[in-house]
């Protein structure tokens, strides 16, 4: 079995736990996920099965969308609801004040990851150091926020809902924290849902319970997405090469290209034969070179 599953992760379990559940349901060993979702977060978690794990970079380095709620008035150790309160404020921000500062959080922005994150500090995960009460500082880095929009605001609950479209590496918890600091009222993520990861969207996502039902009924086609699902931006060459050339590609050998019109203006391609995956290849100087070969 190989391909992708668009899992709708529930709140309360880790991304690693989802992988364990999928392994048990499908009785497969080679499973991975693209883009960690915190235990308190829900939403889209792309799951790679079998040879699809070789394509993880194509599922991770994509735009992602989130809907999240910020609770104003407190700063917490984890920058979400699970942490301890470290600062408080009685200031209640106004809708106009929030909207006014949003442009500062769009584009290439400098961001410091939360201390409770998977960033390495001298070879140790930051969250492990934070749990042990060790003091350390994480370096800031530049990340790309494509869009940040204030959806709603509640003075009664002192909360605000946001829509975020961003690229790889953005921490939603850091955005909530920094919004609160800029407004002078503090803030943390009270609720977080990922609604899109590249081509993985809510409309075809399934729960773990639904996956179990479909698998037990033998309805593999209703949940397993094809290997090429994350390669829709790459040139697809199906039944272009002869059997000898396909054998060479499978063995990692380069192939001289004669029909340049088929691969004009591209440096990568996905090769298949009779719709069966063969390899991801690079293209340069009229030569195709296997980069990732699939064993299917």
UniProtKB/Swiss-Prot annotation:
Enzyme class: isomerase
EC identifiers of the protein: 5.4.99.25
A Pfam family annotated for this UniProt entry: TruB_C_2
InterPro entries on file: PsdUridine_synth_cat_dom_sf (IPR020103), PsdUridine_synth_N (IPR002501), tRNA_psdUridine_synth_TruB (IPR014780), TruB_C (IPR032819)
Example GO molecular function: tRNA pseudouridine(55) synthase activity
Active site (record annotation): 38
One Gene Ontology term from the biological process aspect of the record: mRNA pseudouridine synthesis
Function, as annotated: Responsible for synthesis of pseudouridine from uracil-55 in the psi GC loop of transfer RNAs.
Name of this protein: tRNA pseudouridine synthase B
Organism listed in the record: Ehrlichia ruminantium (strain Gardel)
